[in-house]
Amino acid sequence: GLQTSWFPMRHSENHGRLRRWSYLDKFGCQHGLFSGGQVYLLFLTVYLQEGCKREEMEDAMQIFHYGNLSASTVLIQPVDDHDLEEMETELNEIRKQGKADFQLIAVKVDNWNQDLSPWEASAVFGREGFGDGAGELLQFLLGQCADRRKTYYIGGYSLAGLFSLWAAYQTDIFAGVAAVSPSVWFPGFLQYMKEHDMRAKSVYLSLGNREERTRNPLMATVGDCIREGYNLLKMQKIRTILEWNPGNHFKDAGIRTAKGFAWLIRNQGAE
C-alpha cells in the first residue's frame, strides 16, 4: 500500500536554504517541527483554513509511505522524480531479495544540491553549486524515526547515497546504510570519513564499473574514493561490502538501490 504525506516548508531568500520545517495538521493549521499530525494528499482538497499561505503549499515536501506501515523494519530514502518512477521496481526487488517485511519511507527532495549536501562546494557541472542543507534535512528525517522499537535503515542513490553515508556519521539511529553509487567524489568527504567514526553497524557500498570513466576530473575520482572509503570502514570493524554493478551511473538505479536495502535486511542482527 501507499500513503502520502504533505509537509510544507518555508524557504528563506538565501539560495533556498531551509529556515525551518513546518507542516499542516488535518485541519490545515500550521505547526512547528514534529509537534502534531499529518495531512494526506487524498484529503488536500478539504479542511484548509485561513492563514495557511499558498507559498508554503507550493514549497511542500512530499513523503511517500510504501509497504507494511506496521513492519518493524523501516527504510528511509531521499528521492527525486526519477527514483519515484522506479519505486515499484525497487520495492519488488527488495521483497524478492530481502525476504522480510518492511516499510519504505520515501522523502522527495526538490532541491537536490542544496538539501543533500553536508557543506558548501563549488559547481562540478553546470552553474549550480552545492549548499549545506543536509543537517536540516537529517533533523526532519529523524522525526520519521520516533518509534525506537523499530529498526531504521537509510539509503539512497547518487548524492542521496552520499547524504545517507554522512547521516550515519551524525547519529546511531540508523542500524545500516545503503550508499548506492554515492557521490563520494564530493570535495572533502573522503577526508571526513578518515576523521570520523561510522555510527551505523552495517554499510552497503556499490558503484557501476564504468562510473569512474568520465571526463570530469573530480567525478573520475569516485572509484578510488569508494575503494578507500570501503577500506576505512573495514578498519573500523564495520560490517561492509563493496559491490560493483555493470554499467555507468545512470543504469538500473532502482534495482541497484534495492540490492543495497535487501543486503541490509538480510544481515539484520548479524554479528
What label would you give each PLM region?
Residues 7, 27-34, 38-74, 102:
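A domain-start/cap signature at the N-terminus of enzymes
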Residues 64-147:
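Serine-hydrolase catalytic machinery in alpha/beta-hydrolase-like enzymes
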Residues 155-160, 164:
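Gly/Ala-rich beta-loop-alpha elbow adjacent to hydrolase catalytic centers
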Residues 166-170:
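Active-site signature of alpha/beta-hydrolase-fold catalytic machinery across serine-
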Residues 173-185:
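A conserved short beta-strand
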Residues 184-256, 264:
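The feature captures the conserved acid-bearing segment of alpha/beta-hydrolase catalytic domains
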Residues 257-271:
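Catalytic active-site module of serine/aspartate enzymes centered on a nucleophile-bearing elbow/loop
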